[in-house]
Amino acid sequence: AYGIWDHIKNNKEGIHEHHAENYALEWVGALPGVRESRRLVGDYMLSETDILEHIIFEDAVCYGGWCVDLHAPHGLLDFNLLPSDCNFYDGVYTIPYRSYYSKNIKNLYMAGRDISTTRLGLASTRIIGCCAIGGEAVGIAAALCNKYACDPRELAPHVKELQQLILKEDGFLPGFKNEDEKDLALKAKITASSWEQGGEPEKVANGISRKLGEEQNGW
């Protein structure tokens, strides 16, 4: 990192001049970012097929949309491989609740880059945004486990409640709507003097809080 900064800051020759004389390096991470390491096995192991086929799981608690982004296993030492091989696709996919708790340790949740996926599945789910919202889902699930005095696997009958709580906290789950009976906005009649096609005012309260495909889900 310091060698690269030395080049950016001090090199002033021809096309390689970066005009960084007045810039300063304020912070460098103490540890290198680890793209992947050990993963735990849950009741379900998310695969590349699930991602590419945009599977909507009945117990979905998280979603992702990053490409299946594979990097050379040995980094710079893999001279015959491309540094990164990105397999792009359209749309988003969901991650099931069963990928977030351990298969054989009854009171253990996972969140982040250690969830139950194949290596190709992790190539998409490892992205920070996906890890963050997965962590939020696990936190809500843990609170429900406390409420019902149960282990993670035993929470399965309450997964719909978990999903609705995620949506209530401004989460998003493709294929699921806010169905909270106490949410009065869902019962309101919403009108406007004008709108664009696809942005009809009633969609403000259709229970979906994100744009999905061509549907704006907002006014």
Identify the meaning behind each predicted range.
Residues A1-A185:
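Flavin (FAD/FMN)-binding glycine-rich loop and adjacent Rossmann-like elements that form
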